[in-house]
Design a protein with these regions (language model features):
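An N-terminally biased module of ancient metal coordination in phosphate/nucleic-acid-related enzymes
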Residues: 1-96
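Active-site gating/metal-coordination segments in enzymes
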Residues: 2-11, 72-184, 190
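Short amphipathic alpha-helices and their capping/turn segments at secondary-structure boundaries
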Residues: 15-20, 42-52, 114-129, 186-196
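A structural micro-motif
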Residues: 24-25, 53-56, 98-101, 128, ...
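A short, flexible beta-alpha/helix-coil linker loop
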Residues: 64-68, 139-140, 207
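Short, proline-centered helix/strand-breaking motifs
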Residues: 196-199, 210
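Short acidic/histidine-rich active-site segments
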Residues: 200-204
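Conserved small/polar residues in nucleotide/adenosyl-binding loops
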Residues: 205-211
Length: 212
């Protein structure tokens, strides 16, 4: 069975862009790793990072892969950290190639104080690579629009329990990665105002609404 990503590669390969400033060291701050049918793993990543630019390091961003299949639901996202850490360790065998130097994992930010247990396990298995949490908040009221992959409720970012979790991230010097639709960007600004000591990265500033 062919990889479904092949059709995307065919499209990309129609045009080759000029390499600009090829010697400048770059950190790629956002990529995924996909096992299974739509496979995109270390060798695929290296094919991209070695295509002309000087990409020294990358940061993996959660994509709900390889969750634990047993145990409490709130701890299952730790499986993705375990999965990526193994690949990052494998990459160290080829130090001349791009290294996965950060992992932004998932945890349910509506856990409040309960998030500490999840973060502790991410630290345990991700070690120094574990850098933060993404909990996607993309929500729209229209029935024919698809909400983001964590199935958030309306105004999740503004809830008291979510902001309790944000404060815990800040105390642990972890990053929060926000993922929202264009009409929710003011909510990101509001949580930034509430959490001045927290580093927030924004996955998408004006993400368009996907239809079902």
């Amino acid at each position: 069975m062919s990889n479904p990503l092949d059709r995307h590669l065919e499209w990309l390969n129609q045009h080759t862009e000029e390499i600009i400033d090829a010697e400048r060291p770059i950190i790629d701050p956002h990529h995924h790793l996909w096992p299974g049918e739509s496979q995109y793993l270390l060798e695929d990543l290296w094919d991209d990072t070695s295509s002309g630019h000087n990409i020294k390091h990358t940061v993996f961003i959660e994509c709900t892969q390889e969750f634990l299949t047993s145990g409490p639901d709130h701890l299952k996202p730790v499986g993705e950290t375990i999965f990526v850490k193994k690949i990052a360790d494998e990459a160290k065998k080829e130090p001349s190639k791009s290294q996965i130097s950060g992992i932004v994992s998932h945890a349910d930010m509506t856990l409040g104080e309960g998030i500490n247990e999840v973060l502790d396990l991410h630290f345990q298995y991700g070690e120094s690579l574990f850098k933060g949490i993404r909990h996607a908040g993309g929500w729209d009221p229209h029935e024919n629009m698809r909400n983001s992959h964590h199935s958030p409720p309306k105004d999740m970012y503004l809830s008291d329990v979510f902001n309790q979790s944000l404060k815990i991230l800040g105390e642990k010097d972890l990053v929060f990665e926000a993922w929202q639709y264009h009409h929710q960007i003011n909510q990101v600004a509001e949580i930034a105002d509430r959490n001045e000591d927290l580093t927030i990265t924004v996955s998408y500033t004006h993400l368009t609404l996907p239809t079902i």
